Amino acid sequence: MSLKSKLSSNRNPYVVAQQKTFRLIKKYRDEGLSVYNLIFMQVESPLRSNDFFIKKVCIAAKYKKKIIVGNINTYRDYSWVTEIIKAIFLTSNLKAQDYFISAGKKMSGKKILKKAYSLSNLNYKNYFSSNKKYFRINENEILIGSVKNSFYLKNKFNFSFKIFGDRLIKEMYKSL
């Protein structure tokens, strides 16, 4: 995904609010205000509620509990909150415009389950089940940020995401 990607047709109130805000910020900028649109993929933090996927899986794995999930064959671009905050700070010193901030790395639900349960020395296959009621309607199989986003941050600020994939899961697991 990039700033040129087509806006989602998802009618989820959260998505609708994001789209309206994106358009409104552009109007404010056209009127001379110095405002930014910063778009992120999945931002992970131990401070988020327990129903966010990676945190939910890590809690179940740490306490050796079984978990019911939806589609584990989807891929998302997850970033760690402290790195996102650093990227926000860096882009705030640039010209006000739209920025898409993401690690540009994909990770599947299956990999998250496998890694989290391995941290407890467990085989994830014995601790999860998938239920169609948790599948999202019209869900995109792969949602990752364009690698151009990562290259831009690297070239402009010598900044790159270091916490993603296995390390991100370990950070979440350790934080619980």
Q: Over which residues does each language-model region extend?
A:
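Ser/Thr-glycine-rich phosphate-binding loops at phosphate-binding pockets of nucleotides
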Residues: 1, 17, 171
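Flexible, glycine-rich beta-alpha linker
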Residues: 3-13, 36-56, 75
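Residues in soluble alpha-helical coiled-coils and helical-bundle/repeat scaffolds
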Residues: 30, 48-49, 159
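Alpha-helical hydrophobic/aromatic positions enriched in membrane-embedded helices and signal peptides
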Residues: 7-10, 31, 72, 86
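C-terminal substrate-binding subdomain of Rossmann-fold SDR/epimerase-dehydratase oxidoreductases
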Residues: 61-176
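Active-site Tyr-X1-5-Lys
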Residues: 10-36, 58-63
